[in-house]
A protein has these predicted regions:
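Alpha-helical cap/lid subdomain in secreted, periplasmic
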Residues: 1-148
Length: 148
């Protein structure tokens, strides 16, 4: 059983675009949608509320280079529209969505991973998003508790 969880964050999908899998954006987003359902149906302790869910869109894949070039051949094309597909999935599943594309990008070194400074950017931005979701929820819960 799951203990009380405030928020479950799902940021997946990049490896789905490896050449051997041949997966396109909508299929990868559907996989994330299935994970949302798994979280929603996980057994909870009695009286525990369902956790909120945040889907995070990873930065777009740029041209893979080096050792990742063959492994991710065609990934740029197959992943095209992934953030939009994840945003649609978030709406369909009534969960929160955060797109990393406006704030960060993949490394120029291999086109797949993130440089160290990008982890810092993402961490700071994610902390603000998560804080906002948790504080907003607590304020709503507190107001419900104090309603007369």
């Amino acid at each position: 059983m799951c203990a009380p969880l405030e928020l479950v964050i799902i940021q997946l999908g990049t490896n789905d675009f490896q050449a051997p899998f041949g997966i396109r954006a909508w299929a990868a987003a559907s996989g994330v949608g299935k994970l949302v359902e798994i979280v929603r149906h996980a057994p909870l302790e009695p009286g525990m509320p369902q956790p909120r869910i945040l889907i995070v869109a990873p930065p777009e894949i740029v041209q893979p280079k080096g050792t990742n070039e063959k492994k991710f051949e065609g990934a740029v094309e197959r992943s095209n529209g992934f953030a939009a597909a994840l945003a649609e999935m978030a709406v369909a599943k009534s969960v929160h969505f955060f797109d990393l594309n406006p704030i960060t990008s993949r490394s120029d070194i291999d086109g797949i991973h993130l440089d160290a400074n990008q982890h810092d950017v993402i961490g700071k931005a994610a902390a603000l998003v998560v804080h906002g979701l948790i504080v907003r929820s607590k304020n709503i819960s507190d107001s419900m508790l104090h309603a007369k």
